[in-house]
A protein has these predicted regions:
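Amphipathic, Lys/Arg-enriched alpha-helical "gate/interface" segment within cytosolic domains
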Residues: 1-146
Length: 146
């Protein structure tokens, strides 16, 4: 028999295609490379809009790294990342908790100069070294520089 059409086609509401087409599941955004002992976090295009989003990030990173039983270095891609302003403090607090528990050194990158500045300032306020770069190669090199 033929496949049924998506019922959203007939509804008088947005279809939610943005979510279906653009959202990458959090678990697919996280990858540990055992050979290099580096954890890669791909937040490209990620939108943090609720406290639940922050909790989901914390839980996913902890689930990926806790089994290692030690801290690792990390590289985080923040290209096209967005966060609602009222959640920045909670987000940075979550980042600090993850760093304390799971990371030696973290480098971050985004081509967005405003985001580098904004998140960088918030991280530095909490005595978290920002290590924010404009490109992936600079961030990778930042791991190798003491």
């Amino acid at each position: 028999p033929p496949d049924l059409m998506d019922a959203r086609i007939f509804a008088d509401a947005p279809m939610g295609l943005r979510h279906d087409l653009l959202d990458v599941p959090l678990e697919r955004r996280l990858a540990y490379d055992a050979q290099q002992d580096v954890f890669f976090v791909d937040f490209e295009g990620l939108s943090v809009r609720t406290p639940q989003d922050i909790a989901a990030i914390r839980d996913a990173v902890s689930a990926a790294l806790a089994p290692l039983g030690r801290k690792v270095d990390a590289v985080v891609n923040y290209d096209r990342f967005s966060i609602v302003p009222e959640l920045v403090d909670d987000y940075v607090g979550m980042v600090k908790g993850l760093m304390d528990a799971h990371y030696h050194t973290v480098t971050r990158y985004t081509a967005n100069g405003f985001l580098r500045m904004k998140l960088g300032v918030e991280l530095e306020k909490r005595r978290i070294p920002a290590h924010f770069y404009a490109s992936a190669s600079e961030a990778w090199n930042g791991l190798e520089t003491p």
